A protein has these predicted regions:
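Short acidic, glycine/serine/threonine-rich loops at helix termini
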Residues: 4-9, 164, 171-175, 217-222, ...
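Active-site capping/gating regions of soluble enzymes
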Residues: 4-41, 311-457
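Glycine- and acidic
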Residues: 127-138, 239-248, 266-273, 307-316, ...
């Protein structure tokens, strides 16, 4: 709830338990007045005509939209002609809109006297702080997706692959030197396209816990957008709608999130891990837990956005402004001495250099530019991304419409350059020489009157708090990633040196305990790096024999050529993201237990698996095979919700008739 007086919040607590509001404002009389205005507009008599409204699509006499046709055209022309003068006209026009966002009610205070522009942080350095957020190949056309990657790589910035995986053909630079691969690879609840190879082709891995445009929902790709290419990359079937689960089925607590972060840092020993959160009340507490789970970057995503995988109702009615989530996360992290362990990033409607400055003052070090990047490539905001009928080839898989795509990497480079150039000029005007000088300086923001009672009643002070100790935080985006302890694989990698160097077939044996987590994952990273995913290794080229109880995530993302053989049992997440390896789990020879009657592997087995084999002499726990899209498995039973959201693979689960209760005749 945003912008209500205390009395309304107290009443809401009675009727809507758990509802929170950080921003106070309108009272009961204001609500009554608004209701009367809406009623009067709807009941104009027999001859009255209802207004068009313009809620979804911009109308001249309807609701104000930030992205008006003339404004978009001006920005596109600026990017096409590389004209900063036109960009400044666009920025001025955008800022002349009536107040739409919370930041529109704020003004920037100077640090001191203006400084010469040449003394300010360079455009090149500022550009590296920008990111194009996760927009999948599927939501976007292949041309648009590739263009964003190439553009951001040219300037040392980052693009995000989104949820749908990435074409392996893009993992290598093109003949002209352009790099079409995203530096950030996303891991979402559907785990589409997530393989050991994919996870090793990046500088950063992003766990999408939620999306600002549709918090609480998984990605949704209509069947008409699932082409042969999309189906191949996502390990699914052409023409079949793909819906990701609302939650990650391996994240039901902050400890589970810590385990996934650990898994990702094992499969890619070089990358940082980002956790994408949605702006919401209480996000600060979540951010503190994420920081303690050894994440490196936290993204606070605002409610704007959505590119064809978000229902229109969610885009309009769900989520909160990034200003609220970002300030809360920054404040809580600073209060708990966690802020200098994390890089904060935000996105969700950053349209001008002024927005970037305000986001920095609220605590952001990096900035996501999504919708504006699409507009620079030609998007005209017809708002039919989900229908596969984008007339300019940005958000469609229709080949005829894709041929109309006129975007280029140069246009996106110009866009990010203009953002950086405007930021640089504003920094000089307020007496700052770098963005680092103003990050977290919410005291440099002040609320201003907009001459409207319903706006001036809003109390934005919760956004403007500068907590004790915030002035001692050192903002270092280049710090090494937060380290995680080694697993048994550190020993395996040393012992398997001949296999990794010369491809020698080997068999290694170890005693395993439940404290040995993610066994087989680090060695899989080495296999993918050395031999590739489509290698000529035999399925048991490197066999690891384990005796005992294996910890969580046994064989996570196990690569082709690796066989893990356990005599004992294993905890949760066995074969998570299995990518071609083989896992065999059987009871110890001395075990008196009947295999078919007892659980031998834990919950959420084969979650997001894309290839490989699992054989378990015993039962699996809950959520077995959820989102399996290619692995073949044999188990002797499983708990509830088994094999849900599967798009491929085979699961054989023999059941003894002695376990069934057959109906009797009446």
């Amino acid at each position: 709830l945003v912008g209500s007086e205390m009395c309304i919040r107290d009443r809401c607590a009675e009727y809507f338990p758990g509802l929170m509001s950080r921003i106070s404002g309108i009272g009961v009389s204001g609500v009554q007045k608004k209701a009367e205005e809406i009623h009067a507009a709807a009941w104009q008599g027999a001859t009255g005509v209802l207004p068009m409204g313009g809620f979804y699509k911009s109308r001249k006499t309807g609701e104000t939209h930030a992205w008006k046709a003339q404004t978009m055209h001006m920005m596109q022309t600026a990017c096409d002609r590389a004209s900063f003068d036109l960009w400044k006209q666009y920025s001025a026009r955008m800022q002349s809109n009536p107040p739409i966002h919370l930041r529109d009610l704020l003004a920037v205070k100077p640090i001191g006297d203006p400084v010469p522009l040449e003394e300010v942080e360079s455009i090149t350095a500022i550009r590296r702080r920008f990111v194009t957020p996760g927009m999948s190949l599927g939501a976007l056309s292949p041309e648009a997706h590739k263009t964003l990657n190439v553009a951001m790589n040219r300037i040392g910035a980052k693009s995000d692959s989104g949820e749908g995986g990435e074409d392996p053909a893009h993992f290598h630079p093109e003949p002209n030197g352009d790099n079409p691969s995203a530096k950030i690879k996303q891991v979402a609840s559907g785990r589409f396209g997530v393989t050991a190879e994919y996870l090793n082709q990046c500088e950063e891995l992003e766990i999408k816990v939620a999306q600002g445009a549709k918090p609480g929902e998984g990605g949704q790709l209509p069947g008409m957008k699932v082409t042969d290419l999309i189906a191949r990359l996502r390990h699914s079937t052409k023409g079949v709608t793909l819906i990701s689960p609302p939650p990650h089925h391996d994240i039901y607590s902050i400890e589970d999130l810590a385990q996934l972060i650990y898994d990702l840092k094992q499969i890619n020993p070089r990358c940082k891990v980002t956790v994408k959160l949605v702006a919401s009340s209480g996000v600060g507490t979540i951010a503190a837990g994420v920081a303690k789970a050894e994440a490196d970057v936290i993204l606070i995503s605002g409610h704007n956005g959505g590119t064809g995988a978000s229902p229109a109702t969610s885009i309009k009615f769900a989520g909160l402004p990034w200003e609220m989530g970002l300030t809360e996360a920054h404040q809580v992290l600073a209060m708990n001495n966690l802020r200098d362990r994390i890089t904060l990033r935000t996105d969700g409607g950053l349209r001008t250099g002024r927005d970037i400055i305000m986001a920095a003052m609220m605590g952001a070090e990096e900035f996501g530019i999504g919708t504006a990047a699409l507009i620079a490539m030609g998007c005209i905001m017809v708002r039919q991304c989900q229908s596969n009928t984008c007339p300019v080839g940005v958000c469609t898989q229709n080949e005829e419409l894709r041929s109309k795509f006129t975007g280029s990497a140069d246009k996106v480079v110009n866009l990010i350059t203009f953002y950086a150039q405007e930021v640089r000029e504003i920094l000089a005007s307020i007496g700052a020489r770098s963005l680092d000088e103003i990050i977290g300086r919410a005291d440099l923001l002040g609320q201003v009157s907009r001459g409207a009672e319903h706006l001036d009643d809003l109390d934005l002070n919760p956004l403007l708090i500068r907590v004790d100790g915030a002035d001692t935080v050192v903002y270092d985006r280049d710090r090494p990633r937060n380290t995680v302890p080694d697993t048994l694989d550190a020993e395996i990698v040393r012992d398997a040196a001949r296999f990794l160097q010369d491809g020698e077939k080997m068999q290694l044996s170890y005693s395993v305990q439940n404290t040995h987590r993610t066994v087989g994952t680090r060695i899989s990273s080495h296999i993918v790096t050395k031999f590739g995913m489509r290698n000529a290794l035999q399925e048991d080229h490197l066999t690891i024999k384990l005796t005992g109880s294996a910890g969580q995530s046994l064989g996570a993302f196990a690569a082709p050529g690796l066989k893990l053989q356990v005599s004992g049992d294993a905890n949760d997440y066995v074969g998570k993201g299995l990518s071609g390896g083989m896992i065999v789990v059987r009871p110890a020879m001395t075990s008196p237990l009947v295999a078919a009657d007892n659980t031998i592997i834990g919950n959420t087995v084969l979650y997001g698996a894309t290839d490989g084999h699992l054989f378990a002499s015993g039962r699996a726990g809950e959520r077995f095979g959820v989102r399996n899209s290619g692995a073949k498995a044999v188990v002797e039973g499983c708990g509830s919700n088994g094999c849900e959201y599967m798009t491929g693979g085979i699961a054989v689960i023999p059941v003894s008739y002695t376990h069934l209760t057959l109906p009797t005749k009446a």
